[in-house]
Structure formats: structure tokens, C-alpha cells
From Swiss-Prot:
Hormone involved in the regulation of erythrocyte proliferation and differentiation and the maintenance of a physiological level of circulating erythrocyte mass. Binds to EPOR leading to EPOR dimerization and JAK2 activation thereby activating specific downstream effectors, including STAT1 and STAT3. This is Erythropoietin. One of its GO terms (cellular component) is extracellular space. Produced by kidney or liver of adult mammals and by liver of fetal or neonatal mammals. The keyword Flavoprotein does not apply. GO terms for biological process: erythrocyte differentiation; erythrocyte maturation; erythropoietin-mediated signaling pathway; positive regulation of cell population proliferation; positive regulation of Ras protein signal transduction. Residues 1-26 form the signal peptide.
Length: 192
């Protein structure tokens, strides 16, 4: 193998391992800055949302699940420090991951879980793990934890959902909204 093939092989291996949610050591640290990467996750979230839209049986949860509020006040968001944005995204991603895992457990405990629904929930779990790794490589976790207490973001706004469709809608909205806004700004800032 030539020396020029090694970086290409590492990149190919990194892209193959991303869907597994495994931390990829050889991955370029700014992989999430490639809009195609984030778009792939957004398309997966939209697909899951679309599959569950017409779902009546097996899509209701036996309990409410807490999720992050995905509404964005663009005026406020643009005035926020990138560290405050990182806190909001990091906390939202953590809560969303917990919610999807809880939804996965509730679906597994239902009388007859649909294989299609289970597949989309499993993909969402894997995607959120991968996104967490990509954000960590971008420095979001460091940004979020380096803020002094006095300047930290307001407590994360939340609400509850009771169906898989609503959970996937929040998942899709979070990726298209706050996550896309944050990564866009963090990537631009890193390019300067």
C-alpha cells in the first residue's frame, strides 16, 4: 500500500464506522463541518418521522417522555455566545439521547413491537451516538463545560411527548434547528 492510500483508507474506514456510533480515532476532527454529513443524519430523522406519521398502533408510549424544546428565537440565538449555544445544544442532545433510549425501551416492552419501528429507533440511537462523537471532536463539549456559572445558558426548556411520531418530530427539528445553527457557527468560527 502506498503512503498516499493510507489517509484515504482511514477516511473510508471512519465513514463506515460512523453509523455504528463508535468513536473514530482517525476521523478528521471537523467532519461535521461537511454539510453532507449532517444532512445524512437529518434525512434519517425525517424518514423516521415520516414512517411514524400514520402510525396508530404501537406508537403510543405508556408514559410521557421529556424532550428538549426545539423552538429557536433567531434574534436571541444570534446574540448568544458560541459557548452558550454549545451548552444548549449539548444539553439538548443529551436529553434527546435519553428520550430516544427510553422510547427504545418502551417499544421493546410493548406487546408486539414493529420491526420497522424498532429499526428506526435503533438507527436514531446509533445516529445520536455518532453525532455526540462528532460534536465532541468539534469541541462542543469543551465549549459547554468551560463557561463560568454566571454566564451559563438559561436552564434547558423541555416538554413531554407521548408518541413515537412526536419523539421523531422533535429529533428531526432539533437536528435541522439548533444543531445545524450551532455547527454552522462553530465551523465558521474554526475556519477563521
Amino acid at each position: 500500500m502506498g503512503s498516499c492510500e493510507c489517509p484515504a483508507l482511514l477516511l473510508l474506514l471512519s465513514l463506515l464506522l460512523l453509523p455504528l456510533g463508535l468513536p473514530v480515532l482517525g476521523a478528521p476532527p471537523r467532519l461535521i463541518c461537511d454539510s453532507r454529513v449532517l444532512e445524512r443524519y437529518i434525512l434519517g430523522a425525517r424518514e423516521a418521522e415520516n414512517v411514524t406519521m400514520g402510525c396508530a398502533e404501537g406508537c403510543s408510549f405508556s408514559e410521557n417522555i421529556t424532550v428538549p424544546d426545539t423552538k429557536v428565537n433567531f434574534y436571541t440565538w444570534k446574540r448568544m455566545d458560541v459557548g452558550q449555544q454549545a451548552v444548549e445544544v449539548w444539553q439538548g442532545l443529551a436529553l434527546l439521547s435519553e428520550a430516544i433510549l427510553r422510547g427504545q425501551a418502551l417499544l421493546a416492552n410493548s406487546s408486539q413491537p414493529s420491526e420497522t419501528l424498532q429499526l428506526h429507533v435503533d438507527k436514531a440511537v446509533s445516529s445520536l451516538r455518532s453525532l455526540t462523537s462528532l460534536l465532541r471532536a468539534l469541541g462542543a463539549q469543551k465549549e459547554a463545560t468551560s463557561l463560568p456559572e454566571a454566564t451559563s445558558a438559561a436552564p434547558l426548556r423541555t416538554f413531554t411527548v407521548d408518541t413515537l411520531c412526536k419523539l421523531f418530530r422533535i429529533y428531526s427539528n432539533f437536528l435541522r434547528g439548533k444543531l445545524t445553527l450551532y455547527t454552522g457557527e462553530a465551523c465558521r468560527r474554526g475556519d477563521r
